[in-house]
Amino acid sequence: MERPRLAPRGRAIGVAAAAGLAAAMGVGRFVFTPLLPIMTASTGLGAGDGAVIATGNYAGYLVGALLLTRLPQLSRRGTFLAWSLVLIASEAAMAASAQVAVYTALRFAAGVASAAIFIACASTVSRHRAEGASLGVAFAGVGSGIAVTGLFTLLAGPHLSWQGLWIGSAVLTALLLAPAWLLDIRPEIGTDVTGSRPAPGPRERRAWLLLLGAYFAEGVGYIIVGTFLVAAVAGPDTTAATGPALWLVVGLAAAPATVAWHAVARRFGTGRALVAALTVQAVGVAAPALHDGLVAALISALAFGGTFMGVVVLAIDLGNRLPVARPAATLTTLYAIGQVIGPLLVVPVLGSSFTGAFAIAAMIVAVAAALAAGATRAAAPS
């Protein structure tokens, strides 16, 4: 039987949303990762400073997600344009300062705007799924955006100052957001499913608590890698192109990851796929902690890029299968809190090497895998 094709309108919505997510997440949220070592070399910014600045962005994302959850009317076409301008302006303004406090405030603003854009794009695709809009296509935008930032830094890095790279990132964000401005953004209408689902029994409650713990731990662990992977390979034994090229690998691995892990879930089950993704990520994150070298960093980039978005989709899917209220919102909130904690957690071990930070991240992600395995067993029919 011939597989159904995406309707042209649905396909266009998915692609436009993917461009928006590439701007909001791939550039707006993660461009600091390849730019951090360049700023460190040019301004003397320390690894601890980088952790604080990154935490500002993740805290902003948490605030933005909570804000849009409480006030969904802030997600409309007009406010979407305003959030876009905030994101673009916050990136461009990074070039005009040399103060950690200012950088942190600007990254906080970018985090709030990124969350608003992410929610608007994702909810728009969900609303049009019957027309063929695909969340898999939309979420591929995150990895594509990361790849774009890696390629941009790789090509423009030798020719632009760090200030020029931030301004270029703002221009790149504007270009990627342009298709998303055509989307029909409307407030997401949420429903409390408590009354429509049976009350969870002891096994379901145990599965839910274990899944919450796993997803929180993943938020703490993965973001350590997402913040410091490029900075970790900067040194006398590598060239200026090594870090951006590594970040490009992360993006290329992330782009097809959600579709790939969805296929694994259909074959082996959502819970088993989640455990597998977390296990692969833990092993990959441990590689730079066990061996200083480009091969270990490449393994980490492939494993990290190939799993972190897959974990998001699989964890939320598993949560949606449990008889609990608002699983996606609760999981996303805990994940965002974990991201705020992650960079600050490793500040005491940051120094001339990132080995300690990656070792901590690997152990935390391994704990997430163990908790996810427990959740999968508890959620299985008895």
Positions of the model-derived regions?
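Helix-breaking motifs and short loop linkers at transmembrane-helix boundaries and internal kinks
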Residues: 44, 96-101, 113, 269, ...
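Conserved MFS/SLC helix-loop-helix module at the cytosolic interface between two early adjacent transmembrane helices
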Residues: 62-99
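Helix-to-loop junctions at the C-terminal end of transmembrane segments
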Residues: 64-76, 257-270, 350
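Cytoplasmic helix-loop-helix junction between adjacent transmembrane helices
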Residues: 106-142
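Extracytoplasmic gate region of multi-pass secondary transporters
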Residues: 33, 207-248, 255
